[in-house]
UniProtKB/Swiss-Prot annotation:
Its main location: cytoplasm. It comes from Chromobacterium violaceum (strain ATCC 12472 / DSM 30191 / JCM 1249 / CCUG 213 / NBRC 12614 / NCIMB 9131 / NCTC 9757 / MK). Binds 1 [4Fe-4S] cluster. The cluster is coordinated with 3 cysteines and an exchangeable S-adenosyl-L-methionine. The gene is rlmN. The active site is at E91 (proton acceptor), C338 (s-methylcysteine intermediate). This is Dual-specificity RNA methyltransferase RlmN.
Length: 364
């Protein structure tokens, strides 16, 4: 079986080329061709020796996930469903804005964490994505939008906020992010790559040491009682441990704050007393807040908070000097908004069946 070179960051690719008897600069050349030119044909890599190209044809390949479907939203958001084999597909979303273009990247086929308000979590879990399948989403987006080094960069920011919990696939996610950051890869700054986690505390500490990028934490609740229900990983890593991990992370983070993401669920976590509890929770953690209006999906069991409830919640936080943004819902007409990514998951956890039974019980 041929080796997929997209699975390697620069250090790994250099080692692979050394084992082939090639010099380190060859790895950098191939890295630039693969990632900066979105090239998957070795014959097109014209500054490589013919003998090396022949060797690569024999032993290696540049294999990205193939496109299953693509959709464009009325607001310019684009969503691609990419085939990762055995009946599974993952979704990646490009969100254009005036001053940036953000790509939302998936890290797993489904998700094992079972956050109750998230469509991805309802789909169950199949497996982790490989490095090639993760970085292949950025590769595919650049290819689809005709990007080369001569063009203005279209994807200026990457957020690891698609399907899956990134820190549950630590090694492959970090390797992919290293390619994003590498000057021979995509050359993004650490401030422009954001990883979002539900709060896997040991892996947060590893990330701080190995690849400290901007960090967002899917908080969604001001106390353990609520978070235990809607973000069940909280039972393993409660809020006191999570806040301590956030403080440690800031020692090496590229930004001097954590972004706390908070989905607004009507009657669940959106009352003024919840906002005041939230202020008490984060008092020792430099942070900003991103309030996310809930994006409904069939049989979710939740409703979106009213605009008035969101406004009051936001103002309570702002009065204490915090920066608070309310996420603009983008791509909801193509199910590309936050919490709506479901992909195509051959569930190994039987969670789809469990939720189907719960929904049927509600109806009866």
């Amino acid at each position: 079986m041929k080796t997929n070179l997209l699975d390697f960051n620069l250090d790994q690719l250099t080692q692979h080329f050394a084992e082939m008897g090639e010099k380190p600069f060859r790895a950098k050349q191939v890295m630039r061709w693969m990632h900066q030119m979105a090239e998957d044909d070795f014959d097109a890599m014209t500054d490589l020796a013919k003998s090396l190209r022949a060797k690569l044809h024999e032993r290696a390949e540049v294999r990205v996930p193939s496109l299953m479907t693509g959709q464009a939203s009325s607001d310019g958001t684009r969503k691609w469903l990419l085939d990762v084999g055995t009946g599974n597909g993952v979704e990646t979303v490009f969100i254009p804005e005036d001053d940036r273009g953000t790509l939302c990247v998936s890290s797993q086929v489904g998700c094992a964490l079972e956050c109750t308000f998230c469509s991805t979590g309802r789909q169950g879990f199949n497996r982790n994505l490989s490095t090639a399948e993760i970085i292949g989403q950025l590769w595919w987006a650049n290819k689809a939008m005709g990007v080369t080094p001569k063009n203005e960069r279209v994807v200026s920011n990457v957020v690891m906020m698609g399907m899956g919990e990134p820190l549950a696939n630590f090694d492959n996610v970090v390797s992919a992010m290293q390619i994003m950051l590498d000057d021979h890869g995509y050359g993004l700054s650490r401030r422009r790559v954001t990883l979002s986690t539900s709060g896997l505390v040991p892996q947060m500490d590893r990330l701080r040491e190995e690849c400290p990028v901007a960090l967002a934490v899917s908080l969604h609740a001001p106390n353990d009682a609520i978070r235990d229900v809607i973000v069940p990983i909280n039972k393993k890593y409660p809020l006191s441990e999570l806040m301590a991990a956030c403080r440690r992370y800031l020692e090496k983070a590229p930004r001097d704050f954590i972004t706390f993401e908070y989905v607004m669920l009507d009657g669940v976590n959106d009352r003024p007393e919840h906002a005041r509890q939230l202020l008490e929770l984060v008092r020792d953690v430099p942070c900003k807040f991103n309030l996310i209006p809930f994006n409904p999906f069939p049989n979710s069991g939740y409703d979106r908070s009213s605009n008035n409830a969101i406004r009051i919640f936001r103002e309570i936080l702002q009065e204490q000097g915090y920066v608070v943004t309310v996420r603009k819902t983008r791509g909801d007409d193509i199910d590309a908004a936050c919490g709506q990514l479901a992909g195509q998951v051959q569930d190994k956890t039987r969670r789809q069946a469990k939720w189907t039974q719960i929904i049927e019980d509600r109806k009866s």
